[in-house]
């Protein structure tokens, strides 16, 4: 009898995972193409998520709340990768690993509270300095 919980060949499991992942990606692309807004004269080569029109004349300093929120998202999103790696090895790390993870999460929460108090998460307000 096998020690594995799942009675499936690891190569078959990998093939199923890759096929499902590719299918989900293809489905998302097809649904996005069907649901997107189709405008006459739209330029498909122009990025639309940056918050700044690339052809617009410069009229002073750029208000960059979008870029700040995006940078904060990337910074705080990295914690997920780090905590996922910890969760995979949680049984092996024992109490010391749990304390390390708690300190890491505590530091992240302190950073979040600081950013919240500083106004960095407010989209339309000027930041307090």
From Swiss-Prot:
Membrane topology note: Multi-pass membrane protein
InterPro entries: NAD(P)H_OxRDtase_bac/plastid (IPR023043), NADH_UbQ/plastoQ_OxRdtase_su3 (IPR000440), NDAH_ubi_oxred_su3_sf (IPR038430)
Record's keyword annotation contains Heme: no
Localization of this protein: Cell inner membrane
Residues that span the membrane, as ranges: 14-34, 67-87, 95-115
Recorded GO CC terms: NADH dehydrogenase complex; plasma membrane
GO molecular function, one term: NADH:ubiquinone reductase (non-electrogenic) activity
Pfam families named in the record: Oxidored_q4 (PF00507)
Superkingdom of origin: Bacteria
EC code: 7.1.1.-
UniProt entry tagged with the keyword Transmembrane helix: yes
Keyword field: Cell inner membrane, Cell membrane, Membrane, NAD, Quinone, Translocase, Transmembrane, Transmembrane helix, Transport, Ubiquinone
Catalytic activity: a quinone + NADH + 5 H(+)(in) = a quinol + NAD(+) + 4 H(+)(out)
Stated role: NDH-1 shuttles electrons from NADH, via FMN and iron-sulfur (Fe-S) centers, to quinones in the respiratory chain. The immediate electron acceptor for the enzyme in this species is believed to be ubiquinone. Couples the redox reaction to proton translocation (for every two electrons transferred, four hydrogen ions are translocated across the cytoplasmic membrane), and thus conserves the redox energy in a proton gradient.
Stated family: Belongs to the complex I subunit 3 family.
UniProt subunit comment: NDH-1 is composed of 14 different subunits. Subunits NuoA, H, J, K, L, M, N constitute the membrane sector of the complex.
Protein name, per record: NADH-quinone oxidoreductase subunit A
Organism: Rhodopseudomonas palustris (strain HaA2)
Gene: nuoA
């Amino acid at each position: 009898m096998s020690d594995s919980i799942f009675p499936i060949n690891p190569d078959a499991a990998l093939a199923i995972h890759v096929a499902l992942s590719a299918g989900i990606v293809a489905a998302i692309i097809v649904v996005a193409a069907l649901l997107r807004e189709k405008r006459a004269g739209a330029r498909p080569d122009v990025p639309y998520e940056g918050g700044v029109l690339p052809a617009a004349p410069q009229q002073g300093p750029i208000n960059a709340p979008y870029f700040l929120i995006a940078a904060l998202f990337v910074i705080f999103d990295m914690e997920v990768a780090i905590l996922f790696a910890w969760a995979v090895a949680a049984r092996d790390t024992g109490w010391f690993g749990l304390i390390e993870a708690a300190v890491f999460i505590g530091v992240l929460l302190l950073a979040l509270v600081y950013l919240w108090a500083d106004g960095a998460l407010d989209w339309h307000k000027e930041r307090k300095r």
